Design a protein with these regions (language model features):
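A short acidic/histidine/glycine-rich donor-binding loop in glycosyltransferase catalytic cores
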Residues: 292-298
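N-terminal pre-catalytic "stem/leader" segment of glycosyltransferase-like enzymes
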Residues: 1-85, 93, 282-285
Length: 347
């Protein structure tokens, strides 16, 4: 089989802490580990929009000169302004493009029509959807390009949480942690949860000033903001919760509905900390969590009042070990490597 040179384009990032930027830079690190060639400039971190524009433009121009016939150019979609252009340049030079979707602007933010997004994606030779649900959605809406799926976004970190052995039964008083940016638009369900929670304990990691109406509850602990590396190495919880919207009974609203299609970076973040995750059963990641046995999928958070007491210590320990194994996979770039192996084997 003909050997193709795998290439990518590093760029400027405004920061390395946001979920989107972290996922992209982790992928760049995996590509570098795989021996891929960076045709752009070295990765930079500047918050100046003007400087970022010229740095990214210089990287794009450099790529156009260095790209060769037979290359496979890996793109992280969306690529601001240059996606269709890069795909067309690659085609004219006899190279192929493989594009990993991080976000669909037509589904959540409605920044463009579905037809326009499908048309834009169709410039690429091969698409890697975030997961199988997104893959099915794209095919149902007219995408005719070869397509695979990622599953979960990898999560690389220097830190790793090594759970301490305990003589107590975790299932008697489980603690669930919810970490992330807090806002009424994204996770107001937490307000309702603090009013009614009594069967288990909740730790909220984030700036609670973003949520109005949070109530004092002996079962709820507020930790404030924690850097990601500190969270991963020191989190004291039994499960990580991934839930969006304003309801305890379902994931609703703009962010909640998007869970049907995307693979939240928060899932990978919690798993990297060695935490089994609790996810919505209608989310795109639920089948993955079930497949690997590293968490629980529920239709409503109210179900936890019955599920958690019935979870034996043996079952929890097995789930925790599977989460630990998943943490190692995520740190090694397993999901991207596998998706790229499948993509390039078809070229």
């Amino acid at each position: 089989m003909e050997q193709h040179r795998l290439c990518y384009i590093s760029r400027n990032y405004y920061n390395l802490t946001s979920a989107g930027n972290k996922a992209k830079t982790d992928n760049e690190d995996t590509l570098m580990e795989m021996g891929a060639a960076n045709l752009g400039l070295h990765r930079t971190v500047h918050d100046s929009k003007i400087l970022a524009f010229f740095l990214d433009l210089a990287g794009i121009i450099r790529t156009c000169f260095l790209l060769r016939k037979g290359d496979v150019l890996f793109l992280q979609y969306p690529v601001k302004k240059y996606f269709s252009f890069l795909c067309d340049v690659a085609r004219r030079k006899g190279a192929k493009t493989v594009s990993l979707i991080h976000d669909l602007g037509s589904f959540r933010r409605k920044k463009l029509s579905i037809q326009k997004e499908i048309s834009r994606l169709s410039h690429s030779d091969y698409i890697i959807a975030s997961n199988e649900n997104m893959k099915s959605w794209l095919l149902a809406h007219g995408l005719e390009k070869p397509i695979g799926s990622l599953g979960l976004f990898d999560y690389r970190s220097l830190s790793f949480h090594e759970p301490q052995a305990s003589s107590s039964d975790t299932t008697l008083n489980p603690t669930i942690v919810y970490a992330g940016a807090l806002s009424m638009r994204k996770n107001s369900f937490l307000v309702e949860l603090t009013k009614s929670l009594s069967a288990w304990s909740l730790t909220i990691v984030g700036n609670k000033e973003g949520l109005r109406g949070l109530e004092d509850n002996p079962h709820v602990t507020y930790r404030g903001f924690l850097p990601s590396e500190e969270f991963i190495s020191h989190v004291d919880a039994d499960f990580g919760l991934v839930w969006d919207g304003d309801s305890l009974d379902t994931c609703s609203g703009e962010y909640g509905n998007y869970l049907r299609l995307n693979s939240p970076h928060k899932v990978s973040f919690n798993l990297r900390a060695g935490l089994p995750v609790i996810v919505w059963k209608e989310s795109a990641v639920a089948p993955i969590i079930k497949k690997y046995g590293c968490g629980i999928a529920v239709g409503s958070l109210k179900e936890l009042d019955n599920i958690l007491p019935r979870l034996s210590q043996e079952d929890y320990s097995d789930m925790q070990e599977r989460a630990r194994q998943m943490a190692m996979r995520l740190n090694q770039g397993y999901f991207l490597k596998e998706a790229l192996r499948i993509a390039t084997s078809s070229m």
